[in-house]
Curated annotation (Swiss-Prot):
PANTHER family: PROFILIN, PROFILIN-5. Belongs to the profilin family. GO terms for molecular function: actin monomer binding. This is Profilin-4. A motif (Involved in PIP2 interaction) lies at residues 84-100. GO terms for cellular component: cell cortex; cytoskeleton. Disulfide bonds join C13-C118. It comes from Olea europaea. Occurs in many kinds of cells as a complex with monomeric actin in a 1:1 ratio. The lineage of its organism: Eukaryota, Viridiplantae, Streptophyta, Embryophyta, Tracheophyta.
Amino acid sequence: MSWQSYVDDHLMCDIEGHEGHRLTAAAIVGHDGSVWAQSATFPQFKPEEMNGIMTDFNAPGHLVPTGLHLGGTKYMVIQGEAGAVIRGKKGSGGITIKKTGQALVFGIYEEPVTPGQCNMVVERLGDYLLEQGL
């Protein structure tokens, strides 16, 4: 299976039990910042934004004072799982990022998708990739 099909079929798909509800954007990005696959709507990010995200995974809380920036959008960092998941909020939407051994799985959402639904979609794929040694 190609990385693009993971994005298309597992991240940008309808959310279970909520036909028509799906993430706004999604991507799988290597720890080095190289994009493995992304939805057409995933924002163009700057290397320093990805560096900040990786730093927060290695030193949890790093982004709390400044916020998480991706594609010029600032998200307020909310409770996550230290070293494993970063969650951010902006207005009626937000972002979930799951770290695997080699990649970061990104999901961006807006209402009517809920934070919990985004977390479920992103973390399920991230957990699967971890199980596969990725």
